[in-house]
Amino acid sequence: MQTPPVKDGPRINEDIRVPRVLLIDHNGEKQGEMPISAALEAAEEAGLDLVEIVPNANPPVCKILDYGKFKFQEQKKKNEARKRQKIVELKEIKLRPNIDIHDYDVKAKSMHRFFEEGDKVKVTLRFRGREMAHPELGMKLLLKVKADFDEIAKVEYEPRMEGRQMIMILAPR
């Protein structure tokens, strides 16, 4: 024997298999508890569908409405919620220990934009050759970045050496 396909979403009209329901009419007014047959008749008279809104209630709450319109509204709500969700990305800014003032300002402007967009920023400071002898210069630069963005960002990962580079991660406040 084959099982019927499982429908997602609320049960409508003849799919509602309970003896009594609490009915809400198409104007949103509570009609009270009644047999399912009377509720189906009322929906048919109005030319609309009987939709089970709260199936776990005792008795289940059913509403008379246009099911197509209802489904459309639900889909619209889901899409709006998805649009409002912001996926936080990790952006990377690469610096050098002996960076020029103007170059630093350009990188700072980019970081500022990333924080306004709600993204985290990974500041990577790469050392080459003899620069490895002076990690304090790198630490000084990362502490300057930390101080410059103290108002709009918090440090998520403190400055620390990893091989030939120093890394710090900042997140927007």
Curated annotation (Swiss-Prot):
It comes from Caulobacter sp. (strain K31). It is found in: Cytoplasm. Belongs to the IF-3 family. Keywords: Cytoplasm, Initiation factor, Protein biosynthesis. Its main location: cytoplasm. GO terms for biological process: ribosome disassembly. Monomer. PANTHER family: TRANSLATION INITIATION FACTOR IF-3 (PTHR10938), TRANSLATION INITIATION FACTOR IF-3, MITOCHONDRIAL (PTHR10938:SF0). GO terms for cellular component: cytosol; membrane. Gene3D superfamilies: Translation initiation factor 3 (IF-3), C-terminal domain, Translation initiation factor 3 (IF-3), N-terminal domain. This is Translation initiation factor IF-3. The keyword Protein biosynthesis applies. IF-3 binds to the 30S ribosomal subunit and shifts the equilibrium between 70S ribosomes and their 50S and 30S subunits in favor of the free subunits, thus enhancing the availability of 30S subunits on which protein synthesis initiation begins. The lineage of its organism: Bacteria, Pseudomonadati, Pseudomonadota, Alphaproteobacteria, Caulobacterales. GO terms for molecular function: ribosome binding; translation initiation factor activity.
